[in-house]
Amino acid sequence: MILRLLLAFNFFPSIQGTENKILVKQSPMLVVNNNEVNLSCKYTYNLFSKEFRASLYKGADSAVEVCVVNGNFSHPHQFHSTTGFNCDGKLGNETVTFYLKNLYVNQTDIYFCKIEVMYPPPYLDNEKSNGTIIHVKEQHFCPAHPSPKSSTLFWVLVVVGAVLAFYSMLVTVALFSCWMKSKKNRLLQSDYMNMTPRRPGPTRKHYQPYAPARDFAAYRS
């Protein structure tokens, strides 16, 4: 895509200034690595004390107005965009610089500067320049490596957590062991109480009923 754009626009004839045209020069190509770019448009015309309009367009047919500023050098200028671009800019004696931010890969295209003198008459603008190809590169984010301090803190927390977990396990085992011993002692005491011989209670003596002794001698006589 970029090669086709270069072939299509790099061989345009040089802009020839005429009485009704302004000469504008741009860099042929800008590479964007951090989603921001500054595009300077140099013109050979004295805009001082004149009402003018400076704008930046996107696409081979300049269909999208990226950024624009209206005014003159005696009043503050506000760069703005009506198409969703994050733009700002700066005016110089012979240069208009457009600051574009938060660019995306799909916004890679050719961009054209346009300078117009609105007042006083006659109306003047520039011939279409060769343009500037803005190539927005895709960003690849690498995971940040933890610093030595954060790594040390992490391992300290891991060791402390392991010690606390081990201590909690020991306390749990000790409590369980004590509970089992206590339960066993209660069972032994209960069995001992059941096996202890009981003292017999008082028993009644059974006496034979009294019977008088018989005198066998009387029977003999």
Swiss-Prot record:
Cytoplasmic side: 178-221
Keyword Repressor part of the UniProt annotation: no
Protein localization: Cell membrane
Transmembrane segments: 151-177
Signal peptide location: 1-19
Disulfide bonds: C41-C113, C67-C87
Any one GO BP annotation for this protein: positive regulation of interleukin-10 production
Listed Pfam families: V-set_2 (PF15910)
InterPro entries tied to this protein: CD28, CTLA4/CD28, Ig-like_dom_sf, Ig-like_fold, Ig_V-set
Topology in membrane: Single-pass type I membrane protein
Residues listed as glycosylation sites in the UniProt record: N38, N72, N93, N106, N130
Modified residues (Phosphotyrosine): Y192, Y210
Keywords associated with the record: Cell membrane, Disulfide bond, Glycoprotein, Immunoglobulin domain, Membrane, Phosphoprotein, Receptor, Signal, Transmembrane, Transmembrane helix
UniProt entry tagged with the keyword Membrane: yes
Chain positions found as Phosphoserine: S190
Residues exposed to the Extracellular side: 20-150
Post-translational modification comment from the UniProt entry: Phosphorylated by LCK. Dephosphorylated by PTPN11.
Any single GO CC term annotated in Swiss-Prot or TrEMBL for this entry: external side of plasma membrane
Principal place of residence: membrane
Residue ranges of every copy of the Ig-like V-type domain listed in the record: 29-138
Subunit structure, interactors included: Homodimer; disulfide-linked. Interacts with DUSP14. Binds to CD80/B7-1 and CD86/B7-2/B70. Interacts with GRB2. Interacts with PIK3R1. Interacts with PRKCQ.
Function: Receptor that plays a role in T-cell activation, proliferation, survival and the maintenance of immune homeostasis. Functions not only as an amplifier of TCR signals but delivers unique signals that control intracellular biochemical events that alter the gene expression program of T-cells. Stimulation upon engagement of its cognate ligands CD80 or CD86 increases proliferation and expression of various cytokines in particular IL2 production in both CD4(+) and CD8(+) T-cell subsets.
Protein name: T-cell-specific surface glycoprotein CD28
